[in-house]
């Protein structure tokens, strides 16, 4: 996970369990990809965090997870259609799945940026998911929703092909979602 900070971002280090993290373990990475190499290395996924912050001013916090259901759905390398209106929380009428690339590579970052066009979350093929928000709480809540959506989708397709909401209905939902937290 990471948080936008000054001219870069703070990110969890590579190879340190979250339960053992200390403040001094957190790594600052500038938006040009520089970090203090005498300290902890940033997460191997720092590139896509950097590129998300650089390409989207609405991203102030990012959560990346290998959550069970999102990872299972991502293994099919398909977008999740609008089988449920909550798909709109990710920012569109489907939940995109970024094409597969090896973890930690620029290719993976490019694929994620492509999948996140007009979105706040996406699946990462054969990998997991990424979500962003105004703060860590929002990013984490969205990541939880993505996990829930994927769990529900797995259950829905076990029964058969789910009914997909129309584009016009999703347009209505997307407008409602924009104003949902505003009152």
Please provide the spans of the model-predicted regions.
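Glycine-rich flexible loops
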Residues: 1-183
């Amino acid at each position: 996970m990471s948080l936008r900070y000054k001219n870069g971002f703070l990110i969890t280090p590579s190879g340190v369990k979250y339960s053992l993290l200390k403040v001094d373990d957190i790594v600052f990475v500038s938006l040009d990809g520089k970090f203090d190499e005498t300290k902890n290395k940033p997460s191997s996924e720092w590139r896509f965090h950097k590129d998300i912050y650089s390409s989207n001013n609405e991203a102030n916090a990012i959560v990346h997870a290998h959550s069970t259901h999102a990872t299972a759905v991502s293994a099919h390398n398909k977008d999740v259609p609008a089988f449920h209106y909550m798909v709109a929380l990710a920012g569109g009428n489907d939940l995109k799945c970024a094409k597969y690339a090896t973890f930690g590579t620029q290719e993976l970052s490019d694929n994620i940026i492509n999948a996140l066009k007009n979105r706040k979350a996406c699946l990462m093929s054969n990998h997991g998911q990424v979500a962003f928000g105004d703060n860590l709480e929002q990013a984490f809540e969205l990541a939880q929703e993505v996990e829930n959506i994927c769990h529900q989708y797995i259950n829905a397709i076990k029964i058969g092909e789910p009914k997909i909401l129309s584009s016009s209905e999703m347009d209505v939902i997307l407008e409602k979602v924009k104003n949902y937290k505003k009152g």
